[in-house]
Amino acid sequence: DPKDVPSNFTTFHSENIGGSPSNDKSIKYNNKVLHQSKLVNYFNGDYAKSKIEEDLNKYLKKIKKNKKYVLSKKDIIFIEALKSDGIEISKKYDDLYKISATEMPADIQLMIDNREVGAALLRVIEVIGSERIEDIDDDTVYFIINTLNQLNVDLIRNKLLLKVLPLKV
């Protein structure tokens, strides 16, 4: 209870334990946009692997039929993260988007190839800098998530995905 916190710890309590209003935004789902759909709950652990595969393939089928829907960078980030976790996506959806190999900085790719996990994570932190992850452009978020996928640090990746993908209100 906030009333029981000593006066010299009230700021700490409100920022870290009590929760500040800016961090307590709830997720609003928009099932018309892939990366804002209920499927993002997979990264909370709220979705069975078989169920996410089935639902994602249904969703991609709708997208393929709808010529007006263009996959955004965040949609691609979402799909690539699921693929990294071993989620099977039907081959008929492979042509929905293209990935450029040049999107990963060479120095980070070299660290990943040499299994220098700590160095690669520090480099990612350096890229993020003092910015909030929500404020970073989609291309940079893509390469950060791609790095975390390759390093198999899913816990960190999932927390970042839940910050950047869903619509917060």
What are these regions (language model features)?
Residues 1-169:
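Non-catalytic terminal/accessory regions
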